[in-house]
């Protein structure tokens, strides 16, 4: 089984678009899009990971 990952190297960003392309984090929380997810990854100091694409 391949690990799912997202490149968050260009984050954090000060503002995210409202585009809805959900990602499910390892905290079992659904993030609205890559920007929201990656900002949360940065805030968690890298402890948050991607569980899967789509809603949790």
Curated annotation (Swiss-Prot):
This is Ovomucoid. One of its GO terms (cellular component) is extracellular space. Glycans are attached at residue 45. Residues 6-56 form the Kazal-like domain. The record marks 18-19 as: Reactive bond 3. The keyword Oxidoreductase does not apply. Disulfide bonds join 8-38, 16-35, 24-56. Keywords: Disulfide bond, Glycoprotein, Protease inhibitor, Repeat, Secreted, Serine protease inhibitor. One of its GO terms (molecular function) is serine-type endopeptidase inhibitor activity.
């Amino acid at each position: 089984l391949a690990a799912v990952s997202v490149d968050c190297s260009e984050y954090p960003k000060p503002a995210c678009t409202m585009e809805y392309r959900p990602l499910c984090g390892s905290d079992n929380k659904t993030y609205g899009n890559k920007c929201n997810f990656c900002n949360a990854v940065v805030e968690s100091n890298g402890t948050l990971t991607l569980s899967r694409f789509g809603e949790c």
